[in-house]
Amino acid sequence: IANATGLHVPKNGLAYPSGSVDDIPHLMRPQTVGGVLEQPGMVEVVSCLDTNGKQIANDIRKGVWVCIEADTDYIKHCFEEYKVVTDSTGRYMSLYKKWHLIGLELGLSVASVGIRGEATGAARYFNADVAAFAKKDLPSGSILDGEGGFTIYGGVRPAADSLGQNFLPLGL
């Protein structure tokens, strides 16, 4: 998403804060106003599990969302008029789809390419890179088994950091 939209990623990877759909406007705002984001215009993931590993009610696990800041009083007033869920300041709200039907959406993307020659979700920027990180100490010469395996996990990092520190890409 970062590379398709121009959004940025957290310096040390995603934080995965726990929260319901109603918590998104509180969580997905800059740290300077009480949220988890290093700065405006970042990607993040919301965990559907609390810190004890229990399922959170009204979670967004199977959905997608975007958090929006009202940068004018008029927009803030619109949030109030439409009775959307906001943070305590009324300046941040989220739009979400409870279900992200990726299997059905894939067919639409393929059709868009085939019929209209229109790419969907294509990278236009290089803001983020998914790097491989060891799950445990690995001896030299270890064979990496890839995402979901026993040796490594993927962590998103700013592309400049990934290149500058010679991180191993998880996938190409």
Where are the regions a protein language model picked out?
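C-terminal catalytic/substrate-binding lobe primarily of soluble NAD(P)-dependent oxidoreductases
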Residues: I1-L172
